[in-house]
From Swiss-Prot:
Keywords per UniProt: ATP-binding, Cell inner membrane, Cell membrane, Membrane, Nucleotide-binding, Phosphate transport, Translocase, Transport
Gene: pstB1
EC main group: translocase
Superkingdom in the source lineage: Bacteria
One MF annotation (Gene Ontology) recorded for this entry: ATPase-coupled phosphate ion transmembrane transporter activity
Protein name per Swiss-Prot or TrEMBL: Phosphate import ATP-binding protein PstB 1
Function summary: Part of the ABC transporter complex PstSACB involved in phosphate import. Responsible for energy coupling to the transport system.
Reactions that this protein is recorded to catalyse: phosphate(out) + ATP + H2O = ADP + 2 phosphate(in) + H(+)
Domain ABC transporter: residue ranges: 24-265
Complexes and interactors: The complex is composed of two ATP-binding proteins (PstB), two transmembrane proteins (PstC and PstA) and a solute-binding protein (PstS).
Any one of the GO CC terms: plasma membrane
BP terms from Gene Ontology: phosphate ion transmembrane transport
Length: 270
């Protein structure tokens, strides 16, 4: 048996993952906003059922990279890319990709909680209703399952018909996570999910992230290096649109290979 992470998952060699170990594979990805290139020749693999953190200075391209995984950048008229991203056996950067179907497989949670102006219940089942699910028993089971997975069930089980805006910001963010996982995606993208929350809510979300990987592959963008160290199994350091270093989190933070990485994590710049 190899080395174990704090929650007893074997460390993988992320430079040589097998297909069975890989959730997302990025190969020579370049992305442009108009004539400006913002991602440069990025290649790496995201392991299944682990938390992978993307860190780097503001404007380095980490959120842009994250949005490539569910093609959110397609919503920008001047954005184009080349290279390849695979989700399992499917090339998701192909022009024929069904983007709506992709976003059912790759859920996303943003920086600020964005519940819909609906009840707690209707927030959770929103995606299922879009898929045509009407069976009340199926919907009820999905609500309980998702809210339990988001560590919110016991706080709201008697308030499901209340407007979601009556929840605290931390509860709203967990509700948004529940909404994302209700449709049972394979991958969950988290774009600075705690940056707008207080310390107690942040801790709750961090604890949640470490449990979510039992069912999902999690990719996390964070400006908080301490958070990356606490919750992620693997970390990629992005600088000026380039992947500088990618390794298991403990190794990257304690024994970085690249001087740029060391300078960033020790606060010399960024």
């Amino acid at each position: 048996m190899g080395l174990l992470t704090p929650n007893s998952l074997p460390l993988l060699d992320v430079q040589h993952l097998t297909d069975e170990q890989t959730a997302l594979a990025v190969e020579r990805l370049n992305l442009f906003y108009g004539d400006k290139q913002v991602l440069h020749d990025i290649s790496f693999c995201v392991p299944k059922h682990r938390v992978t953190a993307l860190i780097g200075p503001s404007g380095c391209g980490k959120s842009t990279l994250l949005r490539c995984f569910n093609r959110m950048n397609d919503l920008l008229d001047n954005c184009h890319f080349d290279g390849e991203i695979r989700l399992g056996d499917e090339i998701i950067t192909d022009k024929t990709t069904d983007v709506a179907a992709l976003r059912r497989r790759v859920g996303m949670v943003f920086q600020r909680p964005n519940p819909f102006p609906k009840s707690i219940y209707e927030n959770v089942v929103y995606g299922l209703r879009l898929q045509g699910v009407r069976d009340r028993r199926v919907l009820d089971e999905a609500v309980e399952r998702s809210l339990r997975a988001a560590a919110l069930w016991h706080e709201v089980k008697d308030r499901l018909r209340e407007n979601a805006f009556r929840l605290s910001s931390g509860q709203q963010q967990r509700l948004v996570i529940a909404r994302a996982i209700a449709i049972e995606p394979e991958v969950l993208l988290l774009d600075e999910p705690t940056s707008a929350l207080d310390p107690i809510s942040t801790l709750t979300i961090e604890e949640l992230i470490t449990t979510l990987k039992q069912q999902y592959t999690v990719v996390l963008v964070t400006h908080n290096m301490q958070q990356a160290a606490r919750v992620s199994d693997y970390t990629a350091f992005i600088h000026q649109g380039r992947l500088v270093e990618y390794n298991n989190t403990d190794a990257l933070f304690t024994s970085p290979y690249q001087r740029q990485t060391e300078d960033y994590i020790t606060g010399r710049y960024g």
